[in-house]
């Protein structure tokens, strides 16, 4: 309202307000945040300032002028004992984001803050402001209190320009009471009734807070094994997966969506064939992705069509043999028919395990891209490659300078998220703060290729994929190293 052609002058520089707007609720919230001001009065003051700024004849606006108007209004309301209210360009927010109707509907349904009656009380811009403010506060922990506002602005611009987006729990929960910001967790499943249902309970808590869970059921004794304590017969891993699936059905993630799980079973578990076909009926285990944990020795046996041993995890004894080639073909056939199971290369994962002294990696997050130790969690985020095309030259090209900057800021954002997140279990908090893993990925690759006029199914596309991901990996490692120099190495480094 009335900001077109106006310029805000601050110590940081001159800012054209044409692309910005005054948001009544945002400034009202700023007023009420550190002062005992009734919400109705705070809103009246905010609307007063909006009108005064819009009606100004001068095209230049300074913060002292706004402050003078604010102080006069506070005196009028008898609010002379208020805390100092810092004014800067963040009191204006960017005009509406260019979001599709579908995107807006998803935001309204799952992400935007609602009041006790279910009424939406924030815009997409305010959601991003809430997230940016919360994540930037982590700078204080490292003695960078003066950088909080700077980082808030950088993070806000990243988000509103849709160049980077964090995982859903960060958008949902940052700056709110729940405060659980991580998307993916891995929980151990021990071979006892207590261990199994402890894991189920923990999974329910995580799902309620907005996270997804990965499990390895490989420690569970196979079906029809003797249970020493009762003299009964074990029902096997797949039966307990069904219990986990049913529980997941009943718990919405963060009160907004159903939970998600990953189940992994080692290829040498005696129940591996039952596991491979556990999702043959498409109405079962709908809250699980499943993957077979294969080993190097199994893959070698596949090449030679050799038999391999099945091992009972309860006692480590051989319980039978199967032909590796036949098992592999059964796996591929079932994956072709309905998409599950996938394959996880366990030995390959553990060769890259950065903290082998803490244990073996035996599972991943629900989508499979993030291997984690038992009782470990991770924050994820994605860079939107479609936003990094340079049109200044005759032929569109990738803007690697801008991409480098975004990688570095994204790494910092995700590292800050570790400190700002609340964790559903103390064991997870300890592991996360000890290892400080983050997951930085990409989206918009097809859109990038379209802008570069490169066919998706071409050798050139593969070449671009390798170049871009190699660049992102190299720069993210460099950014991580700088954070290590600045903040210290992660506690479990030694």
List each language-model region with its residue ranges.
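Extended catalytic cores of very large enzyme megasubunits
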Residues: 1-494
């Amino acid at each position: 309202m009335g900001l077109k052609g106006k310029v805000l002058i601050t110590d940081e520089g001159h800012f054209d307000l044409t692309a910005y707007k005054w948001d009544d609720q945002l400034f009202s919230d700023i007023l009420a945040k550190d002062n005992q001001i009734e919400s109705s009065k705070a809103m009246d003051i905010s609307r007063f300032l909006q009108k005064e700024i819009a009606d100004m004849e001068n095209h230049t606006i300074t913060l002292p002028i706004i402050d003078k108007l604010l102080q006069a209004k506070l005196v009028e309301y008898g609010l002379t004992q208020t805390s100092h209210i810092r004014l800067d360009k963040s009191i204006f927010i960017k005009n509406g984001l260019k979001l599709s109707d579908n995107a807006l509907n998803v935001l309204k349904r799952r992400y935007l803050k609602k009041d006790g009656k279910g009424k939406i009380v924030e815009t997409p811009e305010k959601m991003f402001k809430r997230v940016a403010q919360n994540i930037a506060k982590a700078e204080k922990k490292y003695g960078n209190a003066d950088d909080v506002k700077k980082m808030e602005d950088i993070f806000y611009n990243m988000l509103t320009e849709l160049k980077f987006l964090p995982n859903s729990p960060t958008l949902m929960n940052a700056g709110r009471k729940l405060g659980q910001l991580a998307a993916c967790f891995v929980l151990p499943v021990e071979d006892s009734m207590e261990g199994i249902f402890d894991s189920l309970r923990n999974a329910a808590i995580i799902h309620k807070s907005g996270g997804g869970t990965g499990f390895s059921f490989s420690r569970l004794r196979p079906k029809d094994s003797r249970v020493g304590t009762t003299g009964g017969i074990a029902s096997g891993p797949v039966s307990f997966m069904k219990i986990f699936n049913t529980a997941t059905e009943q718990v919405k993630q963060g009160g907004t969506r159903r939970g998600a799980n990953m189940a992994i079973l080692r290829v040498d578990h005696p129940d591996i064939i039952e596991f491979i076909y556990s999702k043959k009926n498409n109405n079962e285990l709908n809250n699980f992705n499943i993957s077979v944990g294969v080993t190097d020795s199994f893959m070698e046996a596949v090449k030679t069509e050799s038999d391999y041993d099945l091992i009972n995890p309860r006692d480590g004894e051989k319980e039978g043999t199967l032909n590796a080639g036949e098992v592999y073909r059964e796996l591929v056939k079932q994956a072709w028919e309905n998409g599950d199971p996938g394959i996880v290369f366990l030995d390959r994962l553990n060769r890259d395990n950065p903290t082998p002294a803490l244990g073996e990696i035996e599972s991943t997050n629900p989508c499979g891209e993030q291997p984690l130790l038992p009782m470990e969690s991770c924050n994820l985020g994605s860079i939107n490659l479609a936003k990094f095309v340079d049109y200044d030259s005759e032929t569109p090209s990738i803007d690697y300078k801008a991409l480098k900057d975004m990688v570095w800021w994204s790494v910092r954002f995700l590292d800050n998220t570790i400190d700002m997140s609340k964790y559903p279990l103390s064991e997870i908090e300890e592991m996360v703060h000890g290892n400080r893993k983050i997951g930085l990925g990409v989206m918009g690759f097809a859109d990038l290729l379209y802008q570069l006029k490169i066919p998706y199914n071409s050798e050139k596309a593969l070449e671009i994929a390798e170049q871009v991901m190699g660049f992102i990996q190299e720069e993210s490692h460099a950014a991580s190293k700088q954070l290590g120099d600045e903040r210290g190495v992660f506690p479990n480094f030694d």
